[in-house]
A protein has these predicted regions:
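Conserved phosphate/ATP/ADP-binding segment of small-molecule kinases
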Residues: 111-115, 121-189
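Substrate-binding N-lobe of the ribokinase-like
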Residues: 1-52
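Glycosyltransferases and closely related glycan-assembly transferases
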Residues: 88, 103-116
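Short gly/ser/thr-rich secondary-structure transition/capping motifs
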Residues: 37, 73-78, 117-123
Length: 189
């Protein structure tokens, strides 16, 4: 997910730096980023296998993610501090939940005044240990929104308004902006 986000941003013409780790089998990923125009200065090459995800998409547009952490879960606080030292107030930091040290990354980015965007996928219980009050933008699907808020309703395509789910997220995180993705039905903000 992180690589896809960086590729999309770079292809859109946004100056993009991708930070993280790749394993011995991941050099092709750095090449994909470079070809898209993303900067890869902050990618570390580590021994072992690359992290990866398998995304299973259902006909209704929903997905299920199977994750192997690999090198993605080997970030160090020293590495985080080094990368963030190159950024400043007002710079965007886009995070997804496939890596480790997210709470630390968010704390340091918040101290610098960076704008934090969080896609909590793949959702797990650790998300509730993160300083979510520091998130400026959430990128959520319906299931993640329900999990974050405890809001237990169906969505519009199943008979109940999606606006109520978006309102629940906004109520839980009043200082954050929210993009709620709705599978084949698009998204709302």
């Amino acid at each position: 997910k992180g690589l896809n986000q960086s590729v999309a941003l770079a292809k859109s013409g946004i100056d993009t730096w991708h930070a993280g780790n790749i394993g011995e089998d991941g050099e092709f990923l750095a090449e994909i980023l470079q070809k898209a125009g993303a900067h890869t200065d902050f990618i570390s090459r580590l021994p072992g296998r690359n992290g990866h995800a398998i995304i299973q998409k259902q006909p209704n547009g929903q997905n299920c993610i199977l994750l192997y952490g690999g090198s993605n879960r080997q970030n160090t606080r020293t590495q985080v501090d080094e990368v963030l030292s190159h950024f400043e107030k007002g710079d965007y930091l886009i995070l997804q939940n496939e890596i480790n040290e997210i709470a630390y990354i968010m704390e340091r980015a918040h101290e610098k005044g960076m704008i934090i965007v969080l896609n909590p996928s793949p959702m797990d219980e650790k998300i509730f240990t993160y300083p979510l009050e520091y998130v400026d933008y959430f990128l959520l699907n319906e299931i993640e929104a329900k999990d974050l808020t405890g809001f237990d309703v169906c969505t519009e395509k199943e008979g109940i308004e999606t606006d109520a789910l978006l309102d629940a997220v906004c109520s839980h995180f009043p200082n954050s902006k929210v993009v709620l993705t709705l599978g084949e039905y698009g998204s709302i903000y």
